[in-house]
Amino acid sequence: MSDKTVKSTNLMAFVATKMLERQEDLDTCTEMQVEKMKTSTKARLRTESSFAPRTWEDAIKDGELLFNGTILQAESTTMTPASVEMKGKKFPIDFVPSNIAPIGQNPIYLSPCIPNFDGNVWEATMYHHRGATLTKTMNCNCFQRTIWCHPNPSRMRLSYAFVLYCRNTKKICGYLIAKQVAGIETGIRKCFRCIKSGFVMATDEISLIILQSIKSGAQLDPYWGNETPDIDKTEAYMLSLREAGP
C-alpha cells in the first residue's frame, strides 16, 4: 500500500467529516454526494487497514494534520479579478495573492519577467491539446499555479480551470480553458490531486459557500521550505506547457 494512497484516504475522511459538520451550507444534492464520498472512503479504509492499520478517527486526524501542515489560509482579503470562458460564457475567478514566507528565499518569484525580442512580455501563444486551449504568455517564470473550481450542485457537476498567475505583474500568464466534470466528488478528487501537486485554490463567491470546509482560497507553495529556488523544476514545468501544443 503506497503512502500516497493512504494520504488520499486520510484527506477524503477529513474533508467528508468537515463538510457534513456544515450541513446547513449544503443543499440536498451536495449532501448526498458528500455522504457517498464518506461511504466510499470508509470502504477504502477497510481495504487499506490490512496493510496500514488505522481507525476512522485516525484517518480524520491524519488528514487534518496533512491539510494544516501543507495548506495555509491566505491572510490578505485583497483579490485580483479575472475570468475564464467556458462554452461562450465568462466565469469570474478570485485569485488569492501570494503572501507565503519565506518569499525572499525564493528569488525566482521576485525576478522580473523577461521581455521577448520586441519588448512584449504579454504576447500570447495559443495551443490546442486534448480538446482544450492553452494560452501561454512568454517568458514568465514567476508564476503561481492555480486551479479554479466552481461547483454546480443543481447539476451535480464541477467546473475547473488551470491558471498560471504572474506574481510580479499581477496578470494571468497562462490558462487552460475550463472543463466540466460529472459528479462533484470526482471533481473534488481532481482538485485535491492538483493541490497536492502544488496548485493554489481559487474560487468564486458561490464556491466559497460549498467549499469553505476544504479551505477555499487556501494556498500551497510548491517551493515551501526551499532555501534556494528550484529553477530546474520551474523550467521543466514551463517546457511541459510549451510541449503541450500540437
Swiss-Prot record:
Similarity comment text for this entry: Belongs to the influenza C viruses NS1 family.
Protein name: Non-structural protein 1
GO cellular component: host cell cytoplasm; host cell nucleus
Primary localization class, coarse: host cell
Function: Prevents the establishment of the cellular antiviral state initiated by host RIGI, which normally triggers the antiviral transduction signal that leads to the activation of type I IFN genes by transcription factors IRF3 and IRF7. Also participates in the up-regulation of the splicing of viral mRNAs.
Keyword rRNA processing among record annotations: no
GO biological process: symbiont-mediated suppression of host cytoplasmic pattern recognition receptor signaling pathway via inhibition of RIG-I activity; symbiont-mediated suppression of host type I interferon-mediated signaling pathway
Subcellular location: Host cytoplasm; Host nucleus
GO molecular function: RNA binding
Keywords carried by this UniProt record: Host cytoplasm, Host nucleus, Host-virus interaction, Inhibition of host innate immune response by virus, Inhibition of host interferon signaling pathway by virus, Inhibition of host RIG-I by virus, Inhibition of host RLR pathway by virus, Interferon antiviral system evasion, RNA-binding, Viral immunoevasion
InterPro entries attached to this UniProt entry: Flu_C_NS1, Flu_C_NS2, NS1
Lineage of origin: Viruses, Riboviria, Orthornavirae, Negarnaviricota, Polyploviricotina
